[in-house]
């Protein structure tokens, strides 16, 4: 792999989640962030606000152009779940084919929609495609106090994958600002999600009880 600060990123789906994880790519790239990253949004009114909030250039609706312009090492793929498969077929499949035809190294794919799973991307993009599904830790601050280190980001690896140990170490480094990283199989992530949702509901109930009950 390249050194961390030399990695190039394209964000497809520059919404709230990609703004929330800005501490991760900001720490990784430092003052090279603005030249090493490019975000794409489908919302005209969000272009300037997202660029200002994240410190990276953001363009409107040109996913294919962003990929060709940046030739990214990593694609942060965060469209709405309903658009994940259509954008894979219309944008990612042609771009990966272009990379192969030119003899270029394929970019890593960080897919944020929970579905499709990594197996789908491998079927569409090739089984040598390095893809993970990612559910970031979404509780990084409570009442103004940082608590990210108590949480974890769930990274789901396809059952058959070609990720190397140093690349998995990179994933841990990238997500470190949001806490620990837990690597899961597709079967394990379903259980982990159920437990996580149950914990969230219980915590809300306990807080409501604490508020309602007398001292």
Q: Each predicted region: which residue ranges?
A:
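Short glycine/serine/threonine-rich phosphate/pyrophosphate-binding segments
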Residues: 16-21, 84-86, 118, 203
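Rossmann-like NAD(P)(H) cofactor-binding subdomain of soluble oxidoreductases
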Residues: 63-65, 70-149
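A structural micro-motif
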Residues: 35, 56, 107, 129-130, ...
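Short, hydrophobic beta-strand segments that form beta-sheet elements in well-ordered domains
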Residues: 37-42, 109-112, 155
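NAD(P)+-binding Rossmann beta1-loop-alpha1 motif at the extreme N-terminus of oxidoreductases
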Residues: 1-74
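Internal alpha-helical scaffold of NAD(P)-dependent oxidoreductase catalytic cores
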Residues: 120-130, 147-191, 198-215
């Amino acid at each position: 792999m390249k050194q961390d600060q030399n990695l190039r990123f394209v964000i497809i789906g520059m919404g709230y989640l990609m703004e929330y994880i800005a501490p991760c790519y900001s720490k990784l790239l430092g003052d090279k962030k603005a030249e090493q990253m490019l975000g794409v949004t489908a919302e005209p009114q969000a272009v300037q606000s997202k660029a200002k909030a994240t410190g990276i250039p953001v363009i409107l609706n040109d996913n294919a152009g962003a990929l060709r312009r940046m030739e990214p090492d990593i694609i942060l793929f965060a469209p709405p779940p309903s658009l994940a498969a259509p954008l894979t077929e219309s944008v990612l499949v042609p771009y990966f084919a272009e990379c192969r035809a030119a003899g270029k190294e394929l970019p890593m794919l960080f897919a944020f929609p929970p579905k499709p799973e990594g197996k789908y991307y491998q079927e569409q993009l090739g089984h040598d495609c390095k893809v993970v599904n990612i559910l970031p830790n979404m509780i990084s601050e409570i009442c103004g106090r940082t608590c990210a280190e108590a949480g974890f980001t769930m990274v789901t690896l396809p059952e058959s994958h070609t990720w190397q140990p140093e690349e998995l170490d990179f994933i841990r480094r990238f997500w470190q600002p949001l806490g620990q990283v837990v690597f899961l199989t597709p079967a394990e992530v379903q259980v982990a999600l159920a437990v996580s949702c149950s914990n969230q509901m219980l915590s809300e109930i306990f807080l409501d009880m604490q508020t309602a009950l007398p001292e």
